[in-house]
Amino acid sequence: MASVGVALPEDGDVAQELVVRAAALAQRLNGRWVAFVICNDSLPSPRAENAMRHAELAMRNGGTVFFCEGEDVAETLLALAAREQIDILILGAPERRWRFRRGTVERVVRAQRTFDVVVVGDGPRA
């Protein structure tokens, strides 16, 4: 059984797209999927509210949600994906600035890991 993980960003539109894709991929693979919400102690109230909305969306779509603290998003994602035995990790790479900037995506992609990474852009789907 395959395990799909998705890192939920602060951007609501991107988070929704990633949830839809993670749920669909897990269903096609007859597997489970989990959503990771990376927080830190200084998370302002509006960002915390967004994180909760994204988590609720993930749960409504059949995902399990992990809220985790971590200042280094890439390292935290790598550790969580390994711990949860993720086979495929989905990350967003939109043009807009958000917490999972290209630097984070590049660091995860280049890291030594035991899972595949799928990077989803915010452009139109082909």
Regions flagged by a language model, labelled:
Residues 10, 82, 94-96:
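Short glycine-rich anion-binding loops that position phosphate/pyrophosphate groups of nucleotides
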Residues 37, 88, 93-94, 121:
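Short secondary-structure boundary segments
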Residues 26, 58, 81, 110-112:
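A generic structural signal for well-ordered alpha-helical segments
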Residues 109-126:
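Short, flexible loop segments at boundaries between secondary-structure elements
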Residues 92-107:
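Glycine-rich, Arg-bearing micro-motifs that act as flexible, cationic patches
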Residues 1-66:
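Small/aliphatic-rich secondary-structure junction motif
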Residues 61-88, 125-126:
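Structural beta-alpha unit
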